[in-house]
Amino acid sequence: MGGFLPKAEGPGSQLQKLLPSFLVREQDWDQHLDKLHMLQQKRILESPLLRASKENDLSVLRQLLLDCTCDVRQRGALGETALHIAALYDNLEAALVLMEAAPELVFEPTTCEAFAGQTALHIAVVNQNVNLVRALLTRRASVSARATGTAFRHSPRNLIYFGEHPLSFAACVNSEEIVRLLIEHGADIRAQDSLGNTVLHILILQPNKTFACQMYNLLLSYDGHGDHLQPLDLVPNHQGLTPFKLAGVEGNTVMFQHLMQKRRHIQWTYGPLTSILYDLTEIDSWGEELSFLELVVSSDKREARQILEQTPVKELVSFKWNKYGRPYFCILAALYLLYMICFTTCCVYRPLKFRGGNRTHSRDITILQQKLLQEAYETREDIIRLVGELVSIVGAVIILLLEIPDIFRVGASRYFGKTILGGPFHVIIITYASLVLVTMVMRLTNTNGEVVPMSFALVLGWCSVMYFTRGFQMLGPFTIMIQKMIFGDLMRFCWLMAVVILGFASAFYIIFQTEDPTSLGQFYDYPMALFTTFELFLTVIDAPANYDVDLPFMFSIVNFAFTIIATLLMLNLFIAMMGDTHWRVAQERDELWRAQVVATTVMLERKLPRCLWPRSGICGCEFGLGDRWFLRVENHNDQNPLRVLRYVEVFKNSDKEDDQEHPSEKQPSGAESGTLARASLALPTSSLSRTASQSSSHRGWEILRQNTLGHLNLGLNLSEGDGEEVYHF
């Protein structure tokens, strides 16, 4: 029953250790697990004790336990004991025999790295073997044991994430009885795993949303926190996320709605009107360092943006944007536009003087040059320009002071990489401000070449104006579309274009290398050949030709191939790629614009003084509701569903009358609801006696009937009806 002997390392394994990790990849995780499980089965077949535990062979098991040569604590390929094997295969009788013979097995964890820390209690809980769980707890199995192996971590390569404690395992498999048993035996509902996640956090991440909501309520019922402890649902993990915020980041709309139902207070019901108070704790971004709204819009999951359509988030964002966000954003856009006009004017009228001395080269066409600092501010016009330059410099400093703190707060990768948060525009505006300061330094030090940073600053500064289009529903999604095309389609296309241009430019250069450059010199110099090929690729110029001389024969062949590949194939491919990107973004343009509005609102709320942006909602202190803030929403529900049913009966009777008047016309049968929902919209053509007005009237009734019955069959809840919401503060 001894362990495996270590294998001798051959030349291959030694070479693998010496080679860099990027040359020799580690073994795939799935293959590694497959190998471990195959070794486990092999080890079970080789060990009589493990095999008897697997097969629940009690007679053999008792004989082995009486044999003094049998090591009851022997382990399998995964570092598991015989009790782990019995629990894995739900063999209660074998587990009881093993615990009677060796009670210490109850506390033994698995030693394999992938499953480290897993006890028999973890396995029994996952398999929902209630009797075995009771037996283990009776023998004082540890309810605080932690399964810390790599197979239990929150990772894309793992199919499940149940946390580390037996209680979280029981909650994730939705075993209410086992959860109660563990809590009664001292399981800590506030226990956190290595990520800081409590059992509530882990429930948010489970795929079965309905069971997760039920278990969430059960666990909260055991939260008997004292005055010195915060509520269980407000305990953050290591990322600072509470279960509520984690639901927003993950886009778990079911859990979000469930939690909001627990936070709402119905004030009154007046016929179809219902007044509801929603608790804005953790929702309102006012004064929050880790804003819920910012977390939602910056989430990598598209489902997270659906949270923005849920009550009361939708109403809160709408109020903030319409009352504060839109006016301040328009003012900010106007100020930036005036600022760019000022900077552009200063650049246009920069101090220049006539160049002294004679030109030394025939291709030199420069007639003006930059003035020295001592000569640049002498006239009245220079003083006016100086004021504009000071405004430009102060504006650049303000931009840097506003942008740099957010980089450290959010993180560079997230701040510059999230399109919804502004992403590339932050890079552009920071680069612009830096170039303005570089231009100032060059002006003060009399350094020639200020035109370089100045020209780049003008381009970047005016490109930043596109950032303010996010305040308009028609233009906002187009900025995202442009960004996706530039960083997606264009980047991929540039790699292909570079390969094609490099290959054909080299060919053109070789062809014209022996020719007279005075007759056709576009390809004589290699850099010029690259530039000419680039222009030909984009069809900026036509193919160079000189009909007074004989061109090389290979030029026609290579140019023909280049025209087919570049103009007909690759450019049209690029257009098709951009068209596909446009279609994909257009499908979610409204959703993207709402996310842009939320991100802009949070940005303005964070940067503006509190006196300019008061807190939204109703303070509960004034009405005996504590120190929390609330949002009042009025729902209007249609409480007369029988009216819709009467419309359906009218449509059915109308169909019967049409059948009697026109027996030759075949109408769809109303026996099945699916057939009613797919009522035919085709006009009857067999009868020619119907007038045009009758046909038009019949078409209108058909459309109205199809829409009404379609809504019914699509799951319209007649007990609630359609409702609209009005929010108040």
UniProtKB/Swiss-Prot annotation:
Q: Any idea which residues bear Phosphothreonine here?
A: T685
Which organism does this sequence originate in? Homo sapiens
Q: Where in the cell is it found?
A: Apical cell membrane
Segments on the Cytoplasmic side according to the record's topology features: 1-327, 409-419, 470-492, 578-729
Q: Which residues carry this modification: Phosphoserine?
A: S689
A GO molecular function assigned to this protein is: metal ion binding
Q: Protein name, please?
A: Transient receptor potential cation channel subfamily V member 5
The record lists glycosylation at: N358
Query: Topologically, how does it sit relative to the membrane?
Result: Multi-pass membrane protein
Ranges: ANK repeats = 44-74, 78-107, 116-145, 162-191, 195-228, 239-268
Query: Residue spans with biased composition (Basic and acidic residues)?
Result: 654-665
Q: In which tissues is it expressed?
A: Expressed at high levels in kidney, small intestine and pancreas, and at lower levels in testis, prostate, placenta, brain, colon and rectum.
Q: Where would you find the membrane-spanning parts of this chain? A: 328-348, 386-408, 420-442, 449-469, 493-513, 557-577
- CDD domains, from UniProt? CBD_TRPV5_C, TRPV5-6
What does it do? Constitutively active calcium selective cation channel thought to be involved in Ca(2+) reabsorption in kidney and intestine. Required for normal Ca(2+) reabsorption in the kidney distal convoluted tubules. The channel is activated by low internal calcium level and the current exhibits an inward rectification. A Ca(2+)-dependent feedback regulation includes fast channel inactivation and slow current decay. Heteromeric assembly with TRPV6 seems to modify channel properties. TRPV5-TRPV6 heteromultimeric concatemers exhibit voltage-dependent gating.
Intramembrane zones: 524-544
* Activity regulation comment: Activated by WNK3.
Q: What are the UniProt keywords, alphabetically?
A: ANK repeat, Calcium, Calcium channel, Calcium transport, Calmodulin-binding, Cell membrane, Glycoprotein, Ion channel, Ion transport, Membrane, Metal-binding, Phosphoprotein, Repeat, Transmembrane, Transmembrane helix, Transport
Task: Provide the membrane-side ranges marked Extracellular in the record.
Answer: 349-385, 443-448
